[in-house]
Protein backbone atom coordinates (compact mmCIF):
# COMPACT_ATOMS: atom_id res chain seq x y z
CA UNK A 1 0.00 0.00 0.00
CA UNK A 2 1.48 3.42 -0.91
CA UNK A 3 2.56 5.75 1.82
CA UNK A 4 -0.15 8.10 3.20
CA UNK A 5 -2.84 5.72 1.86
CA UNK A 6 -3.14 4.15 5.29
CA UNK A 7 -3.63 5.77 8.67
CA UNK A 8 -1.76 4.78 11.81
CA UNK A 9 -4.11 5.44 14.73
CA UNK A 10 -2.32 6.02 18.00
CA UNK A 11 -4.41 5.76 21.14
CA UNK A 12 -2.54 6.36 24.36
CA UNK A 13 0.71 5.14 22.75
CA UNK A 14 3.49 7.27 24.17
CA UNK A 15 7.19 6.84 23.45
CA UNK A 16 9.23 7.21 20.26
CA UNK A 17 7.57 7.15 16.84
CA UNK A 18 10.04 6.55 14.00
CA UNK A 19 7.59 6.09 11.13
CA UNK A 20 8.33 7.94 7.88
CA UNK A 21 6.02 9.13 5.10
CA UNK A 22 2.97 8.03 7.10
CA UNK A 23 -0.32 9.57 8.18
CA UNK A 24 -0.33 9.35 11.97
CA UNK A 25 -3.36 10.24 14.10
CA UNK A 26 -3.25 10.77 17.86
CA UNK A 27 -6.75 9.94 19.06
CA UNK A 28 -8.40 11.51 22.10
CA UNK A 29 -6.69 10.45 25.33
CA UNK A 30 -3.82 11.01 27.75
CA UNK A 31 -0.18 10.54 26.76
CA UNK A 32 3.11 10.67 28.62
CA UNK A 33 6.33 11.66 26.82
CA UNK A 34 6.12 11.47 23.01
CA UNK A 35 8.93 11.84 20.45
CA UNK A 36 8.31 12.17 16.70
CA UNK A 37 11.63 10.86 15.36
CA UNK A 38 10.57 10.02 11.80
CA UNK A 39 10.60 12.30 8.75
CA UNK A 40 8.00 13.55 6.25
CA UNK A 41 4.94 12.43 8.21
CA UNK A 42 1.48 13.98 8.21
CA UNK A 43 0.52 14.01 11.89
CA UNK A 44 -2.91 14.87 13.26
CA UNK A 45 -3.48 15.46 16.97
CA UNK A 46 -7.21 15.16 17.54
CA UNK A 47 -9.34 17.19 19.93
CA UNK A 48 -9.15 16.18 23.56
CA UNK A 49 -5.55 14.92 23.62
CA UNK A 50 -3.44 15.64 26.69
CA UNK A 51 0.33 15.21 26.84
CA UNK A 52 1.68 15.03 30.40
CA UNK A 53 5.25 14.31 29.27
CA UNK A 54 7.37 16.44 26.94
CA UNK A 55 6.35 16.44 23.28
CA UNK A 56 9.51 16.33 21.14
CA UNK A 57 9.77 16.61 17.35
CA UNK A 58 13.27 15.44 16.38
CA UNK A 59 12.41 14.25 12.86
CA UNK A 60 12.53 16.49 9.80
CA UNK A 61 9.83 18.00 7.57
CA UNK A 62 6.78 16.74 9.43
CA UNK A 63 3.42 18.47 9.04
CA UNK A 64 1.66 18.48 12.42
CA UNK A 65 -1.91 19.71 12.80
CA UNK A 66 -3.23 20.26 16.34
CA UNK A 67 -7.01 20.33 16.69
CA UNK A 68 -9.16 21.92 19.42
CA UNK A 69 -8.79 21.44 23.21
CA UNK A 70 -5.27 19.97 23.26
CA UNK A 71 -2.97 20.41 26.28
CA UNK A 72 0.81 20.01 26.38
CA UNK A 73 1.55 20.01 30.11
CA UNK A 74 5.32 19.51 30.08
CA UNK A 75 6.41 21.63 27.14
CA UNK A 76 7.25 21.17 23.47
CA UNK A 77 10.76 20.84 22.00
CA UNK A 78 11.15 21.14 18.24
CA UNK A 79 14.61 19.79 17.43
CA UNK A 80 17.23 18.90 20.03
CA UNK A 81 18.32 20.82 23.11
CA UNK A 82 21.85 21.54 21.88
CA UNK A 83 21.53 21.47 18.07
CA UNK A 84 19.90 23.49 15.30
CA UNK A 85 20.31 20.76 12.64
CA UNK A 86 17.99 18.24 14.31
CA UNK A 87 14.25 18.53 13.74
CA UNK A 88 14.43 20.81 10.71
CA UNK A 89 11.64 22.02 8.46
CA UNK A 90 8.70 21.03 10.65
CA UNK A 91 5.39 22.88 10.29
CA UNK A 92 3.15 22.90 13.36
CA UNK A 93 -0.32 24.39 12.91
CA UNK A 94 -2.88 24.89 15.69
CA UNK A 95 -6.53 24.97 14.63
CA UNK A 96 -8.25 25.70 17.94
CA UNK A 97 -7.72 26.05 21.67
CA UNK A 98 -4.21 24.81 22.46
CA UNK A 99 -2.38 25.26 25.77
CA UNK A 100 1.38 24.70 26.17
CA UNK A 101 2.93 24.98 29.62
CA UNK A 102 5.20 23.24 32.15
CA UNK A 103 4.50 21.82 35.59
CA UNK A 104 6.49 23.89 38.14
CA UNK A 105 7.11 20.66 40.06
CA UNK A 106 9.17 19.45 37.08
CA UNK A 107 11.37 22.55 36.76
CA UNK A 108 15.14 22.08 36.73
CA UNK A 109 17.47 24.20 38.85
CA UNK A 110 17.91 27.12 36.46
CA UNK A 111 16.19 27.47 33.06
CA UNK A 112 12.61 26.66 32.06
CA UNK A 113 10.97 26.75 28.62
CA UNK A 114 7.40 25.99 27.58
CA UNK A 115 8.00 26.11 23.80
CA UNK A 116 11.60 25.51 22.67
CA UNK A 117 12.25 25.87 18.92
CA UNK A 118 15.77 24.83 17.93
CA UNK A 119 15.41 23.16 14.52
CA UNK A 120 16.12 25.28 11.43
CA UNK A 121 13.21 26.18 9.13
CA UNK A 122 10.56 25.59 11.80
CA UNK A 123 7.16 27.14 11.11
CA UNK A 124 5.00 27.50 14.23
CA UNK A 125 1.50 28.73 13.39
CA UNK A 126 -0.94 29.36 16.22
CA UNK A 127 -4.63 30.15 15.99
CA UNK A 128 -4.47 33.60 17.56
CA UNK A 129 -5.46 34.12 21.18
CA UNK A 130 -6.73 30.52 21.31
CA UNK A 131 -3.12 29.27 21.25
CA UNK A 132 -1.54 30.02 24.62
CA UNK A 133 2.07 29.35 25.60
CA UNK A 134 2.37 30.18 29.29
CA UNK A 135 4.90 29.59 32.04
CA UNK A 136 4.58 30.23 35.76
CA UNK A 137 7.47 31.97 37.48
CA UNK A 138 9.49 30.33 40.23
CA UNK A 139 11.87 31.75 42.80
CA UNK A 140 15.50 31.77 41.69
CA UNK A 141 14.73 30.26 38.28
CA UNK A 142 14.72 31.88 34.86
CA UNK A 143 11.48 31.27 32.99
CA UNK A 144 10.86 31.71 29.27
CA UNK A 145 7.47 31.09 27.66
CA UNK A 146 9.16 30.62 24.26
CA UNK A 147 12.74 30.51 22.99
CA UNK A 148 14.31 30.08 19.58
CA UNK A 149 17.82 28.61 19.42
CA UNK A 150 18.49 28.21 23.14
CA UNK A 151 19.45 25.31 25.42
CA UNK A 152 17.59 24.25 28.55
CA UNK A 153 20.65 22.35 29.79
CA UNK A 154 22.63 25.52 30.57
CA UNK A 155 20.42 28.43 29.51
CA UNK A 156 22.78 29.49 26.71
CA UNK A 157 22.25 29.75 22.96
CA UNK A 158 22.96 26.72 20.78
CA UNK A 159 26.48 26.89 19.36
CA UNK A 160 25.38 26.87 15.70
CA UNK A 161 22.55 29.39 15.52
CA UNK A 162 19.03 28.36 14.65
CA UNK A 163 17.92 30.04 11.41
CA UNK A 164 14.92 30.76 9.19
CA UNK A 165 12.05 30.14 11.63
CA UNK A 166 8.54 31.60 11.46
CA UNK A 167 6.53 32.09 14.66
CA UNK A 168 3.08 33.58 14.28
CA UNK A 169 -0.42 34.03 15.71
CA UNK A 170 0.29 32.89 19.28
CA UNK A 171 -0.30 34.25 22.79
CA UNK A 172 2.89 34.06 24.91
CA UNK A 173 2.59 34.77 28.64
CA UNK A 174 4.55 34.80 31.88
CA UNK A 175 2.33 34.04 34.90
CA UNK A 176 2.97 34.99 38.52
CA UNK A 177 2.24 32.80 41.52
CA UNK A 178 1.73 35.75 43.87
CA UNK A 179 5.26 36.09 45.24
CA UNK A 180 8.17 38.26 44.17
CA UNK A 181 10.35 35.93 42.13
CA UNK A 182 13.01 38.28 40.89
CA UNK A 183 14.28 38.99 37.40
CA UNK A 184 14.76 36.78 34.38
CA UNK A 185 11.18 36.30 33.21
CA UNK A 186 10.68 36.43 29.45
CA UNK A 187 7.75 35.91 27.11
CA UNK A 188 10.17 35.28 24.22
CA UNK A 189 13.95 35.15 23.78
CA UNK A 190 15.39 34.63 20.29
CA UNK A 191 18.90 33.10 20.00
CA UNK A 192 21.77 34.79 21.85
CA UNK A 193 25.55 34.82 22.31
CA UNK A 194 27.21 36.14 19.11
CA UNK A 195 24.16 35.43 16.95
CA UNK A 196 23.36 39.13 16.71
CA UNK A 197 25.96 39.47 13.96
CA UNK A 198 24.66 36.43 12.04
CA UNK A 199 21.86 36.48 9.46
CA UNK A 200 19.41 34.20 11.27
CA UNK A 201 16.46 35.29 9.14
CA UNK A 202 13.54 34.67 11.52
CA UNK A 203 10.06 36.12 11.07
CA UNK A 204 8.05 36.79 14.25
CA UNK A 205 4.65 38.21 13.44
CA UNK A 206 1.09 38.69 14.69
CA UNK A 207 1.78 37.48 18.24
CA UNK A 208 0.59 38.75 21.64
CA UNK A 209 3.06 38.92 24.53
CA UNK A 210 1.99 39.63 28.09
CA UNK A 211 1.85 38.84 31.79
CA UNK A 212 -1.88 38.80 32.61
CA UNK A 213 -1.36 41.89 34.77
CA UNK A 214 -1.83 45.59 34.26
CA UNK A 215 0.82 48.20 35.03
CA UNK A 216 0.99 48.75 38.80
CA UNK A 217 3.66 50.85 40.51
CA UNK A 218 2.72 49.39 43.90
CA UNK A 219 4.15 45.99 42.94
CA UNK A 220 7.75 45.29 43.88
CA UNK A 221 10.33 45.97 41.18
CA UNK A 222 11.67 42.50 41.91
CA UNK A 223 8.52 41.08 40.41
CA UNK A 224 9.01 42.43 36.91
CA UNK A 225 9.20 40.25 33.81
CA UNK A 226 12.41 41.58 32.43
CA UNK A 227 15.52 41.65 34.55
CA UNK A 228 16.83 44.65 32.64
CA UNK A 229 16.63 43.01 29.22
CA UNK A 230 13.12 42.93 27.90
CA UNK A 231 9.94 40.96 28.10
CA UNK A 232 10.73 40.15 24.46
CA UNK A 233 14.44 39.95 23.55
CA UNK A 234 15.61 39.61 19.93
CA UNK A 235 19.33 38.80 19.77
CA UNK A 236 19.28 36.98 16.42
CA UNK A 237 20.51 39.08 13.51
CA UNK A 238 18.46 39.89 10.40
CA UNK A 239 15.20 39.07 12.17
CA UNK A 240 11.85 40.63 11.28
CA UNK A 241 9.56 41.50 14.21
CA UNK A 242 6.33 42.68 12.62
CA UNK A 243 2.79 43.50 13.80
CA UNK A 244 3.09 42.10 17.32
CA UNK A 245 1.48 43.35 20.52
CA UNK A 246 3.44 43.52 23.79
CA UNK A 247 1.23 44.02 26.85
CA UNK A 248 2.29 45.21 30.34
CA UNK A 249 5.36 44.50 32.33
CA UNK A 250 5.18 45.45 35.97
CA UNK A 251 7.96 47.77 37.12
CA UNK A 252 11.53 48.11 35.96
CA UNK A 253 13.21 46.77 32.84
CA UNK A 254 11.92 47.24 29.31
CA UNK A 255 9.32 45.61 27.13
CA UNK A 256 11.25 45.05 23.90
CA UNK A 257 15.01 44.72 23.48
CA UNK A 258 16.38 44.57 19.93
CA UNK A 259 19.96 43.31 20.10
CA UNK A 260 20.54 41.85 16.64
CA UNK A 261 22.22 43.60 13.71
CA UNK A 262 20.06 44.40 10.67
CA UNK A 263 16.80 43.58 12.45
CA UNK A 264 13.59 45.09 11.09
CA UNK A 265 10.95 46.14 13.65
CA UNK A 266 7.71 47.33 12.04
CA UNK A 267 4.14 48.17 13.07
CA UNK A 268 4.23 46.82 16.62
CA UNK A 269 2.22 47.96 19.63
CA UNK A 270 4.55 48.08 22.64
CA UNK A 271 2.57 49.02 25.74
CA UNK A 272 3.54 49.81 29.34
CA UNK A 273 7.31 49.90 29.31
CA UNK A 274 9.37 49.82 32.48
CA UNK A 275 12.64 51.74 32.28
CA UNK A 276 12.02 52.06 28.52
CA UNK A 277 9.29 50.83 26.22
CA UNK A 278 11.80 49.65 23.62
CA UNK A 279 15.61 49.54 23.49
CA UNK A 280 17.68 49.15 20.30
CA UNK A 281 21.22 47.98 21.01
CA UNK A 282 22.72 47.02 17.64
CA UNK A 283 23.74 48.42 14.25
CA UNK A 284 21.67 48.87 11.10
CA UNK A 285 18.26 48.29 12.70
CA UNK A 286 15.12 49.71 11.10
CA UNK A 287 12.56 50.66 13.76
CA UNK A 288 9.51 52.20 12.11
CA UNK A 289 5.76 52.54 12.40
CA UNK A 290 5.64 51.38 16.03
CA UNK A 291 3.49 52.67 18.90
CA UNK A 292 5.53 52.67 22.13
CA UNK A 293 4.02 54.25 25.23
CA UNK A 294 3.88 54.55 29.04
CA UNK A 295 7.36 54.13 30.42
CA UNK A 296 8.03 53.69 34.14
CA UNK A 297 5.25 55.43 36.12
CA UNK A 298 4.59 57.55 33.03
CA UNK A 299 7.84 59.33 33.91
CA UNK A 300 8.29 62.27 31.55
CA UNK A 301 12.09 62.20 31.97
CA UNK A 302 12.60 58.74 30.46
CA UNK A 303 12.48 58.09 26.73
CA UNK A 304 9.89 55.59 25.48
CA UNK A 305 12.43 54.50 22.83
CA UNK A 306 16.17 54.31 23.48
CA UNK A 307 19.11 53.47 21.26
CA UNK A 308 22.49 52.37 22.55
CA UNK A 309 25.39 54.79 22.22
CA UNK A 310 27.59 52.04 20.74
CA UNK A 311 25.13 51.26 17.92
CA UNK A 312 25.62 52.59 14.40
CA UNK A 313 23.29 53.58 11.53
CA UNK A 314 19.89 52.94 13.11
CA UNK A 315 16.77 54.28 11.39
CA UNK A 316 13.92 55.49 13.62
CA UNK A 317 11.04 56.77 11.49
CA UNK A 318 7.29 57.14 11.75
CA UNK A 319 6.96 55.99 15.36
CA UNK A 320 4.56 57.26 18.03
CA UNK A 321 5.99 57.38 21.54
CA UNK A 322 5.19 58.76 24.99
CA UNK A 323 5.69 60.22 27.53
CA UNK A 324 8.95 62.14 26.94
CA UNK A 325 8.92 64.09 23.69
CA UNK A 326 12.20 62.70 22.36
CA UNK A 327 14.11 59.59 21.39
CA UNK A 328 17.50 58.97 22.95
CA UNK A 329 19.76 59.50 19.92
CA UNK A 330 23.24 58.51 21.03
CA UNK A 331 23.91 56.06 18.20
CA UNK A 332 26.41 57.11 15.54
CA UNK A 333 25.08 58.11 12.11
CA UNK A 334 21.48 57.31 13.07
CA UNK A 335 18.57 58.72 11.11
CA UNK A 336 15.73 59.89 13.35
CA UNK A 337 12.77 61.61 11.74
CA UNK A 338 9.03 61.93 11.37
CA UNK A 339 8.35 60.54 14.85
CA UNK A 340 5.52 61.88 17.00
CA UNK A 341 6.47 61.88 20.68
CA UNK A 342 5.03 63.14 23.94
CA UNK A 343 1.93 62.69 26.07
CA UNK A 344 -0.53 60.11 24.76
Which residue stretches match the model-derived regions?
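Glycine-rich repeat segments that build the extracellular carbohydrate-interaction surface of secreted
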Residues: 1-29, 38, 42-46, 59, ...
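Extracellular beta-strand-rich, repetitive "passenger/adhesive" scaffolds
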Residues: 1-2, 27-29, 46-50, 65-70, ...
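Glycine-rich beta-solenoid repeat tracts in large extracellular/virion proteins
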Residues: 8-11, 15-17, 32-39, 50-60, ...
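Fold-core signature of tandem repeat domains
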Residues: 24, 34-36, 43-45, 57, ...
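Consensus "Asn ladder" position of solenoid repeat domains
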Residues: 62, 90, 120, 127, ...
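Short beta-strand/loop motifs in extracellular/secreted proteins, especially
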Residues: 202, 263, 285, 314
Amino acid sequence: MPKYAQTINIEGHSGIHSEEYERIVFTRGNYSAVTIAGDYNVIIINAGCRFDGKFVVSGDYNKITIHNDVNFNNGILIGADTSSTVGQGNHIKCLGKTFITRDPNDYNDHTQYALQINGNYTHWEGSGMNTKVALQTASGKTTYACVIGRQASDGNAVSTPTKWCIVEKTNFMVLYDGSSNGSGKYSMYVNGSTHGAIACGHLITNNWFGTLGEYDTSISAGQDTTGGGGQVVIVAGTTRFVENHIQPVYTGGSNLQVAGKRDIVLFNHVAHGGSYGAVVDEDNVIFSGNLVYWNDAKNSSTEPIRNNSSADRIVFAGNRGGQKASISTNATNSQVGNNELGTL
